[in-house]
C-alpha cells in the first residue's frame, strides 16, 4: 500500500465504492439479466473505457481539434468511425454522442427547426421518449403527430400511417422503437417520407446488433439518418452514434458539436472502436443468432396452456427481435407485481406499458423481457428453454409460485453460464 493518493487502488482509496462495485459484480453474476436494453461488455471494452483516454479533452473532430495533443485521440476516433461505417454500410458516422438521447437530439437539430412537425411511434405504443413525448425536449421543441399500433393485432398498419402522414405533413418521419417486437417496413417508411417531402430518421438503438449481424433488415439504405446506442444488442459501452448519407455529414457534425455537446468522452469513443471491431466478427454473429433464438423460445413458452389459463399473453403472438412483450391485462398480476416476482427468483426484467394500457406508467400491464445479456453469457437453446420455463411458471402461478425452488433453478443456470470469470485478476479494483 502506498501513501501517494495517485497510485492507490480503488479498494485502498475508497473501500465503500469498491464494495458497491463488488456487490454489483456479484449481482450480475448470480442473477439473470433480462432487461432488453442491457448487456455485458467484453473485457477489452472494460479496459478501453477505463483507459488513460479518460484524461483527454478533444473538442472538435479528427484533424480539426480545438486542443493540442489529440494525435492519439484522432487515431481512435477514426477507427471507431471507419469501423462503424463498414459494419453498417454507411457513408458517414459520428461517434461522439454521449448517449442515444444526445444522438437523437442532434438528429432533430440537423433535420428540423424548432416548431417543425415530427411524426413517430407513440411512447405508449412502443416509441421512445425522444420521438416526441410531451415532457421530453422533442415534445417541447417540435410539434408532434404520433402514430399508433392497431388495437386488434398491436402491429403497425403502413396504409394508415401513410394516410396520417399525408394529413399531418411532418418535416421528419421517425421509424424505430423501444418496445415493439416486430420488424418495421423501412421501404414503406421511405416511400411515405418521399410522398410528403419529409426526412426519414430511423432510431435503431434496440436492434442495431441484429442489423450488424445481418439478422434484421437494415434501415441504412432507406433512411436519411440512422441513430443508435452502442450498448443494448451491440454490446458496447453505454453511448450513442449517428449514421447517415454523406450529404448530411456537415449538419450532423455541427449538431453534435457544438450544437448538443462540448468535448467528446474519449474513453467512451475508444471503447466504441473496440465494440465495432467485435461487431465484425463471426462470434458476434453467433451471439446475435442466439439472442434471436432465445427470444423466440421465450415467446413460444409464454403462449403455453398454463400461461393462457392464467391470462398471460404475448403481444403480437411472438417476436422478430431480441425482446418479448408480455401482456398481463387479463392476469391477476400487474406489471409491477410481475417484475417484483421475477426479481424475487433472480431474474431482472422491467415492467412496461402495453398499447392501450389501462394502468398508470409506474404500474403498467406488461413486461419487457430481453435476451442480449444472456446470449453474451453464452446461453444456448437449452439455457433459454430452461429460463423460459422458469419465467412462464412464475407468471402462470403468480402469488402461489414456489419462489425458493425457482430461484434454485436460476442459481443453477447462473453457475452453468458464468459471467466475467477471473475478473478479480484483471486488477480493475
Curated annotation (Swiss-Prot):
GO annotation (BP), single: tetrahydrofolate interconversion
Keyword Transferase part of the UniProt annotation: yes
Q: Which GO terms describe its cellular component?
A: cytosol
Please list which residues make up the signal peptide. none
What are the alphabetically sorted keywords of the record? Amino-acid biosynthesis, Cytoplasm, One-carbon metabolism, Pyridoxal phosphate, Transferase
Q: What is its main location?
A: cytoplasm
Q: In which pathway does it act?
A: One-carbon metabolism; tetrahydrofolate interconversion; Amino-acid biosynthesis; glycine biosynthesis; glycine from L-serine: step 1/1
Q: According to the UniProt entry, what is the EC number of this protein?
A: 2.1.2.1
Q: Where is this site: Plays an important role in substrate specificity?
A: 231
Subunit structure, as described in the record = Homodimer.
Spell out the family assignment given in the record's similarity comment: Belongs to the SHMT family.
| Matching PANTHER family | SERINE HYDROXYMETHYLTRANSFERASE (PTHR11680), SERINE HYDROXYMETHYLTRANSFERASE 1 (PTHR11680:SF35)
- State the protein's name: Serine hydroxymethyltransferase
User: Which species does this protein come from?
Assistant: Corynebacterium diphtheriae (strain ATCC 700971 / NCTC 13129 / Biotype gravis)
Amino acid at each position: 500500500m502506498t501513501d501517494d493518493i495517485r497510485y492507490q487502488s480503488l479498494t485502498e482509496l475508497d473501500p465503500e465504492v469498491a464494495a458497491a462495485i463488488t456487490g454489483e459484480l456479484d449481482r450480475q453474476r448470480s442473477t439473470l439479466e433480462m432487461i432488453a436494453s442491457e448487456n455485458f461488455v467484453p473485457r477489452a471494452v472494460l479496459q478501453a473505457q477505463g483507459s488513460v483516454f479518460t484524461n483527454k479533452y478533444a473538442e472538435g473532430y479528427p484533424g480539426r481539434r480545438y486542443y493540442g495533443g489529440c494525435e492519439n485521440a484522432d487515431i481512435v476516433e477514426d477507427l471507431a468511425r471507419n469501423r462503424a461505417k463498414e459494419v453498417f454500410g454507411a457513408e458517414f458516422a459520428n461517434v461522439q454522442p454521449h448517449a442515444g438521447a444526445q444522438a437523437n437530439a442532434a438528429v432533430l437539430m440537423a433535420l428540423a427547426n424548432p416548431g417543425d412537425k415530427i411524426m413517430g411511434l407513440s411512447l405508449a405504443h412502443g416509441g421512445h421518449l425522444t420521438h416526441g413525448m410531451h415532457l421530453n425536449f422533442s415534445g417541447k421543441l417540435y410539434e408532434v403527430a404520433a402514430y399508433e399500433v392497431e388495437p386488434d393485432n398491436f402491429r403497425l398498419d403502413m396504409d394508415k400511417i401513410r394516410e396520417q402522414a399525408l394529413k399531418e405533413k411532418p418535416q421528419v418521419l421517425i421509424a424505430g422503437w423501444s418496445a415493439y417486437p416486430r420488424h418495421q417496413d423501412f421501404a414503406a417508411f421511405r416511400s411515405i417520407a418521399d410522398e410528403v417531402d419529409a426526412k426519414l430518421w430511423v432510431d435503431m438503438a434496440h436492434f442495431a446488433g441484429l442489423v450488424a449481424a445481418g439478422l434484421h433488415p437494415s434501415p441504412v439504405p432507406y433512411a436519411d439518418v440512422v441513430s443508435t446506442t452502442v450498448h443494448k444488442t451491440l454490446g458496447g459501452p453505454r453511448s450513442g452514434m449517428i449514421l447517415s448519407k454523406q450529404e448530411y455529414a456537415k449538419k450532423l457534425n455541427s449538431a453534435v458539436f457544438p450544437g448538443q455537446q462540448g468535448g467528446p468522452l474519449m474513453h467512451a469513443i475508444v471503447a466504441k472502436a473496440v465494440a465495432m471491431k467485435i461487431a465484425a466478427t463471426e462470434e458476434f454473429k453467433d451471439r446475435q443468432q442466439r439472442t434471436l433464438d432465445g427470444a423466440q423460445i421465450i415467446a413460444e413458452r409464454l403462449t403455453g396452456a398454463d400461461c393462457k389459463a392464467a391470462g398471460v399473453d404475448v403481444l403480437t403472438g411472438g417476436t422478430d427481435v431480441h425482446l418479448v412483450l408480455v401482456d398481463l391485462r387479463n392476469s391477476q398480476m400487474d406489471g409491477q407485481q410481475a417484475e417484483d416476482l421475477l426479481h424475487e427468483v433472480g431474474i431482472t426484467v422491467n415492467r412496461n406499458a402495453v398499447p392501450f394500457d389501462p394502468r398508470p406508467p409506474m404500474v403498467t400491464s406488461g413486461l419487457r423481457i430481453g435476451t442480449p445479456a444472456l446470449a453474451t453469457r453464452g446461453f444456448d437453446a437449452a439455457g433459454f428453454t430452461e429460463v423460459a420455463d422458469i419465467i412462464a411458471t412464475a407468471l402462470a402461478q403468480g402469488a402461489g409460485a414456489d419462489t425458493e425452488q425457482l430461484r434454485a433453478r436460476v442459481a443453477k443456470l447462473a453457475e452453468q453460464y458464468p459471467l466475467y470469470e477471473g475478473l478479480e485478476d484483471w486488477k480493475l479494483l
